[in-house]
Amino acid sequence: RRGVHWSIDPASGNATRSTPRDSERELQVCAQCHSRRAQLAEGYRAGAPLHDHYLPSTLEEGLYHADGQQLDEVFTWGSFRQSRMHEAGVTCGDCHEPHGQKLRAEGNAVCAQCHASAKYDAPSHHFHPMGSPGAQCVNCHMPATTYMVVDPRRDHGLRVPRPELSLALG
């Protein structure tokens, strides 16, 4: 994150990264724990190429719904890797503190780092009363699935909800 800044475009309400992401290194370091993967070799160290040691699961039948949302336990890497956010240069550290389970901001403020609150944190966007669970960005864009009865995890695909696709594809 050193030297990287996000500037919000007033017209779109979305942010642009100041410098292109030049590496997958951060995502690969996170993926050693936060991906569904098969181990190929022992001795992975942070900074080493992930694929020299692990084979992460990607879009495989049974792991994702037909629209790309996670179906089974994929540990966030797979869904994030296929997201528009990843494509735009977002990294894990833009939202998460790397050495703990804390987000860089609380609630919708984590999204407002890159998305204009006036446009997106408003009933005209989310169609819910302010402060309600439906008004929380993650409840539409990062739906949660609970694994092993006690472990809720959010889909990191960060998709735009498409109810018509859900109806058509099941």
Predicted feature descriptions by range:
Residues 1-170:
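Primarily the internal scaffold of c-type cytochrome electron-transfer domains
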